[in-house]
Amino acid sequence: MEELKEYSCVILSDIGANTLLLPSATFARSEKRPNRTKLIRDYVREGGGLIMVGGYLTFSGVDAKGKWHDTPVQEVLPVEVLTVDDRMEHCEGVTPKAVKPHKILEGIPEEFPDVLGYNKTIAREGAEVLAEVEGDPFIAVMECEKGRSAVVTTDCAPHWAPVEFCEWEHYGLLWKNIADWVTKSE
């Protein structure tokens, strides 16, 4: 935990829970190791920031292999992770829209560039949904005891985030605002 506290924020993107739950010492040699999902949960509760970004192994992901639903990290996320494959593929593009004013969205237009997919989630009680896509959370945030968490349910890079999203003039500001909010630097 002390090493984790050296950082203001943890960002999880395109990583399944098993990456943290099955370190090589445990998987290959059956050795005990700290549960890193518990460490992240406790880190957030004690004042750290957490951002989860969508992708094929984030949230529940492809074939539900992300497996974040039943982990301690779920306790500090502003959304409920599904137990089934949660990928919402939209090759035609779908437009995320801001639905609630918040510091994270300062300087950001109400409509975002289209995305080509996202992870379907359900907002948790106590969370604030700041932007939606197809009626689902796109950006959601939550206070978690002394810390904060945020989710962006699409990827930060292709294929779900096409060029027009990644090169959007507000792209950098959006991520800066999210990081500033979860780290209480705003």
Residue ranges and their predicted role:
Residues M1-E2, D42-Y43, K65, N119-A123, ...:
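A general structural signal for short secondary-structure junctions and capping/turn motifs
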Residues E3, R36-L39, H69, Y171-W175:
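Stable alpha-helical elements in mature extracytoplasmic
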Residues M1, K38, E134-F138:
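Alpha-helical scaffolding within the catalytic cores
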